[in-house]
């Protein structure tokens, strides 16, 4: 029996940013569509990575990230943001926000669920919401300070 893709695979679309990057490369242009970092790696980050490699720290972490990092994030949230969080149940460290958002959507959304999407938004979010068979509801923020009115919130979802 030949291998075939699932029906849900058709719901996953190339992001607009990636499409622009490919088109830019095709015509030999200058890519302004993607936020690719071109700054030097901070010395402490590189040294920390080397120390971890030398110490043999090269295996998968727990599904929710390194315990020490989750606790450091919880401390930062309390000290800097004034928000108490439980690093064991309220903080997850992922390899990136895109993958984390995709996992969260698949874990939390059922077909037909509505998701409030504030404009402007990262285009990939729409593809992820649609892949989870949910329905995006677009809510515009108001210039010049890009705020929203919670009084309008009743009309955001059914």
Predicted regions and their residues:
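Short beta-strands and strand-loop turn motifs
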Residues: 3, 31-34, 138-140, 158
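Conserved core of the PLP fold type I
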Residues: 57-158
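N-terminal small-domain helix-loop-helix segment of the aminotransferase-like
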Residues: 8-95, 103
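Generic N-terminal amphipathic, Lys/Arg-enriched alpha-helix
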Residues: 1-9
